[in-house]
C-alpha cells in the first residue's frame, strides 16, 4: 500500500503496524473516522507481533481486561466471516491444580467467571485427560475448562484488521519511518517521516 503518495496532512496518525496499531486503525474506521493514516517502518507484523503465541484467555483478575478479552473473542469470530479471516481457533483452555489450595482458587475463578457470563466449568482428571491426552496427571487434583478461549494467528489477525481498516478508508504506509513527533504548546502538531 506504500505505492500511494504519503499525504501531507491527516487528522489522525497511527504509528506502528503491528496488532496494536492495526487494531487502533480498524476501530477508528469502525467509528467512522476517515482521515486516518497508519505508518509502519517495515512491513506489517514485522515487530513483536510476529513473536506472539496469540493465546486468548478471557478470564482475568481485572474486570476491564476480562471484558476486553471477551470483546476480542467476538471480534475474532466476526473477522473469520470477513474477506480476510484472522485464523481464530476456538479450542478452549484448561487450567489445572496441583494442590487443594490451587483447586480452591480455581473454584473461586469459576464463580468470578459467572459474573461475566463465561461458562468456566470444573473438570475432573478424567475430563482433563480426555481434552489433553498427553498430560501426566500424577500431581493433578483437578482443573477447569473454558470452551470459548482459543488461539489466533497474530500475523493473520494483523492483516485482517489492516484489511478492515483499509475498507473503512484508512491509508496504510509501510517502509515509512517516523523520525519525530512534533509538539507545540504541549500538543502534537505533526510527525516527521523519512519520506
What is the meaning of each model-derived region?
Residues 144-195:
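Helical element adjacent to the flavin cofactor pocket in flavoenzyme catalytic cores
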Residues 53-131:
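Dinucleotide-binding Rossmann-like beta1-alpha1 core, especially the glycine-rich loop
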Residues 6-20, 37:
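Beta1/beta-strand and adjacent pyrophosphate-binding region of the FAD-binding site
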Residues 4-7, 30, 88:
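Short, flexible hinge/linker loops that cap or flank conserved catalytic cores
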Residues 25, 29, 164-166:
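Gly/Ala-rich phosphate-binding loop of Rossmann-like dinucleotide-binding domains
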Residues 29-49:
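Glycine-rich FAD pyrophosphate-binding loop
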Residues 40, 124-125, 174-176:
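Short loop/edge segments at beta-strand edges and connector loops
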Residues 101, 132-140, 182-189:
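A short, glycine/Asx- and small/polar-enriched loop/turn
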